[in-house]
Amino acid sequence: MTGYENKRFVHRKELNTEWEALWIWRSRRVRVNDFAYFRKEFSVRCPLKRALLFYSAHHTAAVYVNGTRLGGYVSPAPTNPEKRKAYLAYDVTELLADGRNCLTADAHYLGGSGQNYYDGLPGFRLQLQLVYEDGTETVVKTDASWQALKEMPHAVGTPYQQNRRVSAIEAYDARKLDPEWRYAGWRKEGATVKAKPALIGSDDWPMEAQRIPEGAIAEEIKCVKLPQPNGGEAEFAQVFDAGAIVSGWPRLALKGVEGTVVRLRYSEDLDENGRVKHNVTNEFSDRYYDEYTMRGDELETWQPDFSFKAFRYVEVTGYPLEIAEGGVTVCWAYTGMAQTGEFSCSAEHLNKLYAACIRTQKNNTLGQTVDCPHREQAQYTADTDLQAEALLYNFEAVEVVAKTLADFTDAQLEDGTFPFVAPINYENPDFHIQIPEWDLHYATLMWKAYEASGDVGILKNGYETARRMVDYFLSIRDADTGLVPLDKGWHISDWPYPSVEHKGQFLTVQQIKLVLALRAVGRAAALIGRAKEGGTYAEHAERLSERIVEQLYDRERKRFRDSSESDARHQGVTAIALAAGLVPDEDRERAIASVAEQSWECRTVLSLPLLRMLFDNGREAEAFALLDRTEYPGWGHMIAQGSPTMWEGWEDIESHSHAWNGYPARLLQEYIVGIRSETPGFAKTTIRPYMPDSLTFAEGKIATPFGPVSARWERTDGGVRVRATIPAGMEARLTLPLADGRIVEQALTEGENEMFFAK
């Protein structure tokens, strides 16, 4: 799947509806991991011009029209419903028939104060607007006339699968749902009760059309059945390998054995006996499974798709028969954004690195950008800022990033700071956490989304949030030093397993990130008509930059100290300072050389500014060497170990599908292929490749607001051949450094460009 396409899904930003429908639930009681099964019959008279169906749920629902399931999965996308509640819209005209029709919905409420959502209250809301050819209109809406199933196939109150209470075990008993339930004419005395008004008032939650695509099944993976596990267990276990870690769920297609409880357990890895481990990455969990109780049909199919799981291996227990090929399929699912980026070159390990970055990014876009798709599924500003590198170059993802910004706007605290993730149950003591450095990424993420899209609306929407955030940090500056001291929360300069020292009250990386945030806020203000404020924030950034140099720069060694009382001069601290332009001009070349020639000590967070600084300052060879290496540490080491996804850090010990390590994909496209934006929105674009001696060709394509841009360079016996495709409306140039020291400058035209440069 290159993009999610559902013809019934109405995906228009301007689509709105006046809500008449009530929020309903099956009772007035709030229970964790609760379900409700709803049903409504109604009449349609043809000819029907158009039928639009709108629905929302807290937290998710699956809606059926005459037995046909609508749309995608794990919908609506998570938000703080008190600030905005997403709803979906579908054109269902073709699904309705003359006469009696039936709507059904299966809704799920999580509750439980988990890490990556907002508890809110249970509820389901649907409105079907029927427009006839004669101009008349009718509305079918949720109210007390809807039926709710008394005894549901989904068990209520099942345990959470992770320690962070992200998703619940689906325990589904197929015997409890009559197959005719979803069709008009079903009758069963005493099987239903009238739906109750939910505890949510009709106007309590602001309704907003969902702007990002729904979850979609991208690929149905035919699993490889592994040999029977060792260990002599009495339990009959059958283990299946999807070939890589995927987000999604398994699908069963098995001969039914009535009353048999089939358990599906998930993990990234296996134990020494070939069984699926009882864990969620590096955290123990005995509950990372779902269960299906069989009805006894000749063929039964089922998939636990109310939540995203992430795993490579599926272990089936409880089923007494040998499972043949096709009995277990893994559905790889994620937010259905179109992939438009590409990269390939003559080095296969770099092609595998790019593919692993993209696969990992897909795994971590699940209605929100998440750090990992299994342990937390949580949305962090810093993680999204790093992910935005690959996201915005390779996918139609501006709306996905905009949702992250909106989620943090909704979560912003009174003083302008943020919880460490959003959405979140911040009142839960387990998740009452803040990371000050991560707050500062809000402003740089906002600017990054603007640079990719050229859409000033992103700045208008995020400016007040970003302004309030930087104002907080300005308000706590130390009067003597002018620097921001250690404050509430958990401070991170680099991650994971960092070696940056945090000694004293003032952390250098935090100061530099505040400078970058102030600059972003200042530029944003200027672009949205608030020039005076823009000038003020630019002045704050300049003064803070001066204070950082005064207080934290070692002029003798041409390096920045890690913190105010540290004797360490970490590579990454000076790298981010160089990237931010804070090193005095007279020392800059020596500082660049010092960082470039040092052994690699940065982790994931500081390796991005390190690489960008090297590529942008004439040290392309050193930067490429870090991308190209296959030994520890680095991304290539993961590939050399056979991993098809990116890990949380360099070590093979925690999450093995962590998207913040996916930014090498963008760096390969931007620096090796050479596709670079010169102005926000790619109105001006330069093709300037770095052509390392170890490669004979490299090619790539990226998404821009004007359309795709592609480029390819290739060495031949006689010279270098370059091809570039430029969309209409874009101003583009080729800047090509040749081996003899010449730099070729040439304008590119709309459409195909092919050039050859002799040795």
Language model region names:
Residues 1-375, 383, 399-402, 415, ...:
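Extracellular/oxidizing-compartment recognition motifs
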Residues 32-33, 242, 378, 436-437, ...:
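Short helix-capping and inter-helix turn/linker motifs at the boundaries of alpha-helical repeat units
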Residues 51-52, 249-268, 306, 317, ...:
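Alpha-helical support elements that line or immediately flank enzyme active sites
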Residues 60, 125, 143-151, 323-356, ...:
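Active-site acid/base region of carbohydrate-active enzymes
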Residues 61, 70-73, 77, 408, ...:
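Active/binding-pocket-proximal capping segment
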Residues 127, 141, 147-182, 186, ...:
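Non-catalytic C-terminal accessory modules of carbohydrate-active enzymes
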Residues 155, 163-172, 376, 394, ...:
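C-terminal capping/lid segments that line or modulate ligand- or cofactor-binding pockets
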